């Protein structure tokens, strides 16, 4: 019974997304941007958090991930910083890949987060006793910021694109964020023998 319901729901979902795809815009400049977001302790059953991040190249989405955490985090700052460190590693890996392919990336990659506190820690090596538990991630990101290999900036929660993967949203909010992902409903015109019956 459960497997039948799961199969039915899966087919309904797949039927509903058949015409959707990513619309790649013409690139005006090759620059990397990352967006990182945490839905801290969002699951009321087990208090685990969901994290997600996106990476854009020239305004086009090229990489994304979301994941429910395996452990409960007591501090949202620690979780946000771990996610920022993971996103930084992905961006640096992409930079090295583009360098090997002799593709020049313009400027310093920008990493957007909706936490003013985390953004402040990223550009300030002054620690206090409450941030010792995230010291390695802080040092890693600060090192990249000070070397001008990364620029961490604040973005308001309303503009935070990874919400589409990490939080339950209203239909209007989902549609708004879906447009920012450059996910588009394509219409296909079949002619003659190309028709699907």
Question: Which functions belong to the PLM regions below?
Answer:
Residues 1-21, 156, 166-168:
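C-terminal reverse transcriptase regions that engage the nucleic-acid substrate
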Residues 10, 37, 55:
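Conserved hydrophobic/aromatic pocket- or pore-lining residues that grip, position, or stack substrates
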Residues 12-36:
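Structured nucleic-acid-interacting core domains from mobile-element enzymes and related host factors
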Residues 16-20, 41, 61-63, 97-100:
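Conserved helix-loop functional segments at active or binding sites
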Residues 31, 49, 61, 67-197:
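RNase H-like nuclease module associated with reverse transcription
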Residues 38-46, 116-119:
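Short acidic, Gly/Ser-rich segments with clustered Asp/Glu that frequently serve as metal-coordination loops
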Residues 43-59:
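Acidic, metal-ligating active-site segments
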């Amino acid at each position: 019974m459960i497997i039948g319901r799961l199969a039915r729901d899966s087919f309904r979902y797949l039927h509903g997304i058949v015409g959707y795809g990513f619309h790649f815009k013409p690139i005006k400049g090759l620059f990397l941007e990352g967006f990182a977001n945490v839905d801290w302790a969002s699951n009321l059953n087990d208090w685990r958090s969901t994290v997600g991040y996106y990476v854009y190249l020239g305004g086009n989405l090229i990489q994304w991930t979301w994941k429910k955490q395996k452990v409960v985090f007591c501090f949202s700052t620690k979780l946000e910083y771990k996610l920022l460190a993971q996103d930084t590693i992905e961006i640096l890996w992409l930079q090295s890949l583009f360098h090997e392919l002799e593709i020049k990336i313009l400027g310093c990659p920008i990493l957007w987060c909706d936490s003013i506190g985390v953004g402040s820690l990223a550009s300030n090596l002054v620690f206090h006793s409450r941030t010792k538990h995230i010291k390695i991630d802080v040092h890693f990101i600060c090192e990249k910021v000070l070397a001008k290999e990364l620029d961490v900036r604040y973005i308001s929660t309303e503009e935070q694109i990874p919400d589409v993967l990490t939080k339950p949203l209203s239909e209007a909010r989902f549609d708004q964020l879906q447009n920012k992902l450059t996910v588009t409903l394509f219409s296909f015109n079949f002619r003659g023998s190309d028709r699907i019956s």
